């Protein structure tokens, strides 16, 4: 098994990333790369899937896959249960890192920064366009808590369906969005012989500085 893992590799030869291709600020490049991923990546890859890393109050890291649900000039938005493990971690230490990986394009984007809650109005607006099952699930699931078995979860959902049988569910107070306000964004383009292209943007005094990093 160890040798098999050691032999697993691929060479990246699809494209390069030069300073001439990169704008002065990172959002334009992210929009371009994300649009390329939407057009190019095929299921089961989801272009808006990302790894979100957080740190708990003891300094221990945690990561999981989430879906990006908003992007504007302020930052990158995702939604979750505020009482979940990640919600508690962000309450204790409001900083996070995101990583997008688009294997067909041989590209990766790393984003780091401070995290803030979005407004209740923004959370409600997104909540209302979710499928009904997802809206009910936000009420039914005590996310990250220990439950007895799958049947308990089904019972919680059934009770929630009965509760809202005559009305549409409102957005729960314990559920909503976070926005990561980027302070660093790195664009990685795979290249041959592991000599990858890495362009890094750092926010300093409200201005973005671009630099090339060694692979």
From Swiss-Prot:
Cross-referenced PROSITE patterns: PYRIDOX_OXIDASE
Pfam family, one: PNP_phzG_C
Its EC number(s): 1.4.3.5
Catalysed conversion reaction: pyridoxamine 5'-phosphate + O2 + H2O = pyridoxal 5'-phosphate + H2O2 + NH4(+); pyridoxine 5'-phosphate + O2 = pyridoxal 5'-phosphate + H2O2
Cofactors (names): FMN
Cofactor remark from the record: Binds 1 FMN per subunit.
UniProt GO MF annotations: FMN binding; pyridoxamine phosphate oxidase activity
PANTHER family: PYRIDOXINE-5'-PHOSPHATE OXIDASE, PYRIDOXINE-5-PHOSPHATE OXIDASE
Subunit structure comment from the entry: Homodimer.
Function: Catalyzes the oxidation of either pyridoxine 5'-phosphate (PNP) or pyridoxamine 5'-phosphate (PMP) into pyridoxal 5'-phosphate (PLP).
Identification of the protein by name: Pyridoxine/pyridoxamine 5'-phosphate oxidase
